[in-house]
Amino acid sequence: MATRRYCTLVAAVLNTKTARKLISFGVKMVQKSPAVWRRIPPIYIDETAHPVTSNQDYDVPRLAKRVFDEAPRVERWFIESPCMRRIVEVQVMLPPRPEEPAPMLYLLDGVTAPRRSGWLREGQLEKGLNNEQVIVVMPTEASGSLYENWVADDPEVGRHQWDTFLTQELPNIMEDPTTGLKFNGRRIIGGLSMGASGAIRLAAKHPEFYHGAIGLSGCYSTTSAMGRGMTLAILRCVGSDPDNAWGTGPTPTWARNDVADHPEGLRNIPVYLFAADAHITKYDIELHTGRTRLDLPGATILEYASYTSTRDLERAMINAGMTHQVVHYQYGGVHAWEYYGDQLKAGWDAVYKSQVS
């Protein structure tokens, strides 16, 4: 376990300009060589749930079951999914006033994306949106999926067809009046980390479908050295083969999914982006004291990559003539759940409440 002294030492080392240059250099070198990135250990494999593809051929998506879950106003929905060929479990937080119409927020998880959404597990959804009139939809069991359609099933993580599920199958269920949900017609998508990358990418690819997007500490490039390196790390850390996601090497599919290279889809929808600069603060030292010794260095590297990527996306949007995006850079802070409740609220205010007030 990490002591306060250890965390203070990590901060002294990683808060230097030299360390930032070494992080960038290291990530760039890793992504260049398959012999290196294929050796990235599956550090999250014990924390994730990889549901087995049942190979069940469902004709249409259907709500098979709906039960109360562990938190107030939270239900678990079991969706028969034709594209995933299995039952996909989705956690749904109902609005505080269910008799009144509400928008839907599709809220995506980080890399582990287990059966219980991290937004609920870490208490940050309650912190950020508990009193907001919104239906929050949280897909689960999406470990390392990038929330994308993969070109092939993976022997470790199974079948991922999340683009189709999130933009076609799941909305058909959620917006069906027979569920009793009073939907006001507005859809927002958001997430943190891997979920931020997925949310912004899906919004850019389906701008006619979403009415706003929130990206918290995401990585939005798939072809830059930093972006490709972090994407490979996400895929390998859950034990999957990156070739099954978008193909082997720099394929056209990898290129198409680079939002920093193709930001045009974000032109006409509200966008909120957040990243901290990965400068380790006293608060971060307190947070990580008692955690594993790898947590603080890992959180620093992840947030530095997110910070770099967010700046790249903002620059691309500005160069394309976009000025509507709200981008918040925080001085101090690493990749840690404790920051995201407040930022979820800020993002919600920016992309939804400011548009309807």
Q: Where does each model-flagged region fall?
A:
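Non-catalytic cap/lid and distal C-terminal segments of serine-dependent acyl enzymes
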Residues: 4-7, 11-13, 19-31, 36-357
